[in-house]
């Protein structure tokens, strides 16, 4: 179930302040955040935001097609190592 259309998209205030402060600087730095729940706004385009995945900060370069999605969608939290090999040949 998605967010109600009556409400505005959510973004953490501290993240929005960091992006606005970065807009005034001529040098673009990586913005670190723990806010996986924040929605990507059009003003984020062109910035690199390091999203925390539980172990480390994963750098995510924001592009135009990411607008409207959540930051956490682009920093997976689980590592998939694959299923165990098929042992039918070794059982014989």
UniProtKB/Swiss-Prot annotation:
Coiled coil: none annotated. Keywords: Ribonucleoprotein, Ribosomal protein, RNA-binding, rRNA-binding. It comes from the Bacteria. Gene3D superfamilies: 30s Ribosomal Protein S19, Chain A (3.30.860.10). PANTHER family: RIBOSOMAL PROTEIN S19P FAMILY MEMBER, SMALL RIBOSOMAL SUBUNIT PROTEIN US19M. Protein S19 forms a complex with S13 that binds strongly to the 16S ribosomal RNA. This is Small ribosomal subunit protein uS19. It comes from Streptococcus pyogenes serotype M49 (strain NZ131).
């Amino acid at each position: 179930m998605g967010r109600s259309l009556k409400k505005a998209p959510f973004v953490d205030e501290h993240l929005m302040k960091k992006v606005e402060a970065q807009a005034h600087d001529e040098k673009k730095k990586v913005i670190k955040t723990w806010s996986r729940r924040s929605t990507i706004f059009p003003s984020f385009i062109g910035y690199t935001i390091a999203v925390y995945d539980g172990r480390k900060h994963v750098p995510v370069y924001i592009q135009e097609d990411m607008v409207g999605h959540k930051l956490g969608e682009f920093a997976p939290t689980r590592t998939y190592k694959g299923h165990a090999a098929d042992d039918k040949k070794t059982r014989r």
